[in-house]
Amino acid sequence: KNWVWTRINKSKSEADYRQWFALLKECGISGVMFEGYDENLYRMCKEAGLEAHFWKWTMNRAELLNVHPDWFAVNRKGESTHDKPAYVDYYRFLCPNHEGVAQYLADDYVKIAHLPYVDGVHLDYVRFPDVVLPVSLWKNYGIEQTSEHPEYDYCYCDVCRTKFKEQTGRDPLELKYPMEDQSWINFRLDAISRVVDQITKAVKADGKAISAAVF
């Protein structure tokens, strides 16, 4: 299947969108991933023979800054994305191991899946912040990342440190080369996977499709 992603443009007319949806269908596009929700737009999309999916950030959740400040990921320097995000101000990533995070996200996506004319949901930012950016972006931030720097390496919050120590007997903050420790790498990968599993089960139980942007 072929898909397109788009932001909802309030300045475009209904006729503009109908023409665009028809063109997408003619070009062999299967569906549209929308950033945002507009019931009429989703309905028109489906009337054109396309699937309509709701695209949304997963681990990057600034709406929780005041409600659950403890849920945010912490880097190797002890800095939280709650008040000191990496790279850009909107990088407010959650820690997947905090109790309540996975359930909150699953409930949020199910609410989206329940919306009229929504065929499925698409998960983006299903990860921790970039520990190393592409070389082409280094100059944008005035950095050089020839190795993993502690200020971009997450999550070293108390919950993650405790859980990892229970599993391995080691504190991740005491690892000499955390970037090469496979058990520490897998610990964080598995934490993200468990969140995705919970979201997936909840959305599929509602009879809707789910996909993700893998980085």
Regions found by a protein language model. Give the residues of each.
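Boundary/entry segment of secreted carbohydrate-active catalytic domains
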Residues: 1-20
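Active-site beta-loop-alpha junctions enriched in small/polar residues
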Residues: 7-9, 37, 57-59, 126-128, ...
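Catalytic domains of carbohydrate-active enzymes, especially glycoside hydrolases
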Residues: 14-40, 115-118
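Aromatic-lined carbohydrate-recognition surfaces of secreted/lumenal glycan-active proteins
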Residues: 53, 122, 126, 178-215
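Active-site-adjacent "subsite" loops/lids of carbohydrate-active enzymes
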Residues: 53-116, 133
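Active-site-proximal loop/short-helix segments
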Residues: 122-180
